[in-house]
Amino acid sequence: MRTIQGALGLASRAAMVMTLMVAATSSAAAQNTEGPWAGPAGAAPGKYADVNGIKLYYEIHGAGWPLVLLHGGLGAGSMFGENIPALAKNHRVILVDLQGHGRTADIDRPMTLEAMADDIAALLEKLQIPQADVMGYSLGGGVALEVGVRHPEMVRKLVLVSTALRSDGGYYPELRAMQKGVSGAVADQMKGTPMYQLYMAVAPRKQDFPRLLDKIGTFMKSDFDATSQFVALKTPVLYMIGDADMMPPSHAVEAFALRDGGKRDGGWDGAGRSKLAQLAIIPGATHYDIVANPVVAVVAGRYLEQP
């Protein structure tokens, strides 16, 4: 299932440079000397796990119920910024760099949501964690959804941030058209963006950046519809977007309704609320700065701590 990949927001050459710089500005105060999106200063040193033929980079922060954080396309786990220590106050946060991203080198296999979801499941097995909460942003939201679909017994709750369920109607039309232009051919034009700078700072093989763009571009060109998989999830979901995201708020409301949300008054005792989903629309947040927005950690933390 090629789903949610378009949510990466890496659209046209001009749009990439302009919008990604917004994300760098929004989290600049949290960065260390490794460059934009390098994460909060004093971050714990990471480790590598051999899973499915890939050396998967991960970090563990805090203690408590395990929470896996999955980053967006061309980013790394560190792009969650100060939301990492905020969530680690009450959770054992497992921060992962997905295939070909951050400190995890690419391997000779297609970059698919299914394969990356299986990597996460294998990592949890290796860490002897039978069940965890999984929170994904953009591309990471697609991976998180796949973990819930393919390994339902390993997921207690899901948090999907800025994650479209389908290409048709999931994005503003002009963005969908631009997304199909991503390829390694735009690598030089990415120089100066926070994603390029982060990759150059931490990637094991810096020469692979055009290859990463090619792989992401390949599946971004495909139309997708993950509605049926979203409906069939056996785990409760918090669906979160910004009110100025690359997808219209109506898409989030539609997703909420698919999980029995927004269909009745919740009642004084809350008995009428959906047991399958909650919806959060973060005010003033765009697709490019929501990942490090402190409200995200507050809303997600509250949701995850509910029975």
Question: Where are the language model's segments positioned?
Answer:
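Active-site nucleophile elbow and catalytic-triad environment of alpha/beta-hydrolase enzymes
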Residues: 213-229
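Short beta-strand/loop motif that positions the catalytic acidic residue
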Residues: 233, 239-241
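Flexible "cap/lid" loop of the alpha/beta hydrolase fold
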Residues: 142-150, 156-196
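Catalytic active-site module of serine/aspartate enzymes centered on a nucleophile-bearing elbow/loop
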Residues: 271-307
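Active-site loop/oxyanion-hole signature of alpha/beta-hydrolase fold enzymes
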Residues: 95-135
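Conserved loop-alpha-helix segment in the C-terminal half of the alpha/beta-hydrolase fold
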Residues: 85, 243-285
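Alpha/beta-hydrolase fold catalytic core
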Residues: 2-4, 10-11, 18-67, 90-91, ...
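Conserved HGGG/HGGXW glycine-rich cap/lid loop of the alpha/beta-hydrolase fold
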Residues: 54-105
